[in-house]
Amino acid sequence: MKDNQTLYRYEFKYLVNEKVSEQIKGNVIKFMNVDEFARKMNSNSYFVSSIYFEDDFNTNFTEKIDGNKIRKKFRIRNYSKDLNNDPIFLEVKGRNLDRTFKKRTKIDYEDIITINNRRNINSLLKKYPNNDIINQFIFELYKKNLKPKIIVNYSRTPFANSQGLYFRLTFDKEISSDFLPVIMCGKMVKDSIGIVTIRGSNMNVLKKMSL
């Protein structure tokens, strides 16, 4: 995914136990490939960590639970347990009616400290000139008094369609979360429960592939 490029897609999520997840994975691997990034890992999976921002009223959480069709949220995401050795992204993700969208830009570890301390945040505007995500994030940060509220970690095994339309299937497990400022893996959601997510650019194809 290119920097500052908006990706639109349809998305369906399912809670499944480990047995069902492995059964689906066994069938999927017959006609889909593990994505290029995950193939570099021994287990065909990679670590994902996301820090989510919220206002004082937990509006993002409430809108998600209520199923609002128009919503968005900001998060910091990386794919390694060592922030100093891995790309870090500031992302905005949301929903516009039936489709979800995601847009991201690469940032540095020092920027996370700047955001967390809320000191000299405007320096990011000079560091990343004409960056839509940075501009939007800082505006929302001040307007809604956004703060990093929760961190979510998990292991992801992704499959991608090698030909034709954009189609992606991911299996997430070992899901844990904790409230900030405690930045560490904390409360395990449940060992045997995972999330299967189907994403794609064509609604008709996704309906046929849905569980």
Which functions belong to the PLM regions below?
Residues 1-211:
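Phosphate-end processing signature that detects enzymes handling 5′-triphosphorylated RNA
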